[in-house]
Amino acid sequence: LWDIKAKRAGKPLWLLLGEMEPEELVSTLDFRYMTDALTPAEAVEILREGQKGKAERIKHLLEVGYPGYSTAPGWLGYSDEKMVALAKEETQVKGFKQIKLKVGQNIDDDLRRLAKAREAIGPDVRLAVDANQVWDVPTAIDWINKFHDFDLAWVEEPTSPDDVIGHATIARAINPIKVATGEQMQSRILYKQYLQANAFG
């Protein structure tokens, strides 16, 4: 329905939502099971605080676009040469400022691939990794802590997406590398618990 409303208004959905007043936007949300972490009044206050500089941010997004990242070079099974070539193409030709590599099958392969990727993209392009839930918590911590030399922006799905406490434990242990969840978040309750536990950042 939101997509239809945005199309009727002749604007992208992000802009339609961004132009709403905080109270109007919050009134569209269901806060059931959430108010121990965030009340509607607190949400309005957060959004009201975000109004500062909003016009400039919208102008920037309309002119430049929203920053994305490329997963093209990051698939497991690519030769080092193919991964490096794709990393250079995505960043130097297509202009991506971040790439993401899959990791988690073999630590030596991961270290080699990350070193080659970082060399190919240079220090100014962000590099992230995605483990696709392959590790338990101790393995994730051990493995990711070997990645600090590559200046990672974040690691996605280091363990089961249902393990909120595990993600929080990992996040504390690998700091300053951030933890991200993927597309597997099952409910707003889990999302709330992630926020309460500082399990991603």
Question: Where do the PLM segments sit?
Answer:
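Acidic/glycine-enriched edge-of-secondary-structure segments
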Residues: 70-76, 169-178
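Glycine-enriched alpha-helix->loop->beta-strand junction motifs that scaffold or abut catalytic
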Residues: 95-97, 121-123, 145-153, 171-179, ...
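Catalytic beta/alpha-barrel core
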Residues: 99-107, 128-133, 150-162, 177-186, ...
